[in-house]
A protein has these predicted regions:
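Non-ligating segments of multi-cofactor redox enzymes
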Residues: 1-100
Length: 101
């Protein structure tokens, strides 16, 4: 399920340069979930993007996983390293992660 695209199209936020959905009130620190229904619900307009020239997420990514706007190298992403990687975290990335586990 393309959760971010569905959430964007539903007006819940916009896709930031870090490739996560950003909600104007909640930021990007939340989980997405879906309920599929055939109920006739009102449709919200998609949210417009507000990143503009901001590159803060790229600048502060501790492991340099955001290699370009809208492009993430998952092999450097802390979420991948701590949840999905089935081997030891590469030694070069450990100091960059700090206590973010």
């Amino acid at each position: 399920v393309l959760e971010r695209a569905l959430a964007r199209d539903a007006g819940l936020g916009w896709i930031g340069k870090h490739s996560c959905l950003i909600n104007k009130d909640a930021g990007s620190w939340f989980f997405l979930g879906e309920i599929y229904t055939d109920l006739p619900l009102p449709v919200d307009a998609p949210a417009s993007a507000h990143c503009g020239t901001c590159t803060r997420c790229i600048e502060v990514c501790p492991t340099g996983a955001i290699v370009a706007p809208y492009r993430v190298d998952a092999r450097r992403c802390i979420s991948y390293l701590t949840i999905e990687l089935r081997e030891s975290i590469p030694e070069a990335l450990r100091p960059l992660m700090g206590n973010r586990i």
